[in-house]
């Protein structure tokens, strides 16, 4: 059928789910914790860097859902740019400066996506380098911060992989794990049923 054939679900439902998923990226993240643990200033740019990391994790998950998932990815990103523009206007940034900032953010976003994609399929050193470049702006002298971020991304992507694709396409509902978590293994669903000694 090719790319132009009908999608598995109604396009409007997918767009609404995409907006909901993006909303989960901005409303369910503890930005103050990220700013504190990563020594980031409380600015629009820092907000954007943390948001784009979570948007990227959603894109990684939704690309696994075929054409409908890729269609949803377009609208997650579209929702992000609309939100960035609105936040800039609310902050009183003039239109020329905002346009230039958004152009710069677009370049940053696609460079980050490339780096994060490479990092997630590689080892922790590559992912740490991508986080250092893109989230921390090459300003981190504490390797424990990078270790925390690498662990966070790995556990979050692993958790998102356990979520049902059909539900994600229809609802866009995503729950985020805390940045600092005592037992990261607690997020994983058991891959096989567990039984006691009696086989129950």
Curated annotation (Swiss-Prot):
**What is its subcellular localisation?**
Mitochondrion inner membrane
Which key words tag this protein in UniProt? Membrane, Mitochondrion, Mitochondrion inner membrane
A single GO BP annotation from the record?
A: mitochondrial respiratory chain complex III assembly
User: Sorted alphabetically, which Pfam families does this protein's record hold?
Assistant: Ubiq_cyt_C_chap
GO cellular component terms attached to this protein's record: mitochondrial inner membrane; mitochondrion
Biological function: Required for the assembly of the ubiquinol-cytochrome c reductase complex (mitochondrial respiratory chain complex III or cytochrome b-c1 complex). May be involved in cytochrome b translation and/or stability.
Q: In which family does this protein belong, per the annotation?
A: Belongs to the CBP3 family.
Q: What is this protein called?
A: Ubiquinol-cytochrome-c reductase complex assembly factor 1
- Per the UniProt entry, what species is this protein from, by scientific name? Xenopus laevis (African clawed frog)
């Amino acid at each position: 059928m090719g790319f132009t054939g009908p999608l598995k679900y109604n396009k409007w439902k997918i767009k609404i789910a995409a907006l909901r998923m993006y909303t989960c990226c901005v409303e369910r993240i503890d930005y103050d914790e990220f700013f504190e643990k990563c020594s980031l200033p409380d600015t629009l740019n820092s907000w954007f860097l943390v948001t784009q990391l979570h948007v990227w994790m959603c894109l990684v998950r939704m690309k696994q859902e075929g054409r409908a998932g890729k269609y949803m990815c377009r609208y997650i990103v579209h929702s992000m740019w609309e939100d960035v523009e609105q936040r800039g206007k609310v902050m009183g940034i003039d239109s020329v400066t905002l346009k230039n900032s958004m152009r710069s953010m677009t370049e940053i976003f696609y460079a980050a996506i490339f780096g994060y994609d490479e990092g997630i399929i590689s080892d922790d050193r590559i992912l740490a380098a991508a986080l250092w470049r893109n989230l921390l702006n090459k300003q981190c002298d504490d390797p424990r911060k990078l270790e925390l971020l690498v662990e966070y991304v790995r556990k979050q992507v692993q958790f998102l992989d356990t979520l049902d694709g059909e539900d994600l396409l229809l609802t866009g509902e995503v729950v985020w794990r805390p940045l600092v978590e005592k037992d990261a293994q607690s997020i994983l669903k058991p891959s096989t049923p567990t039984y006691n000694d009696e086989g129950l």
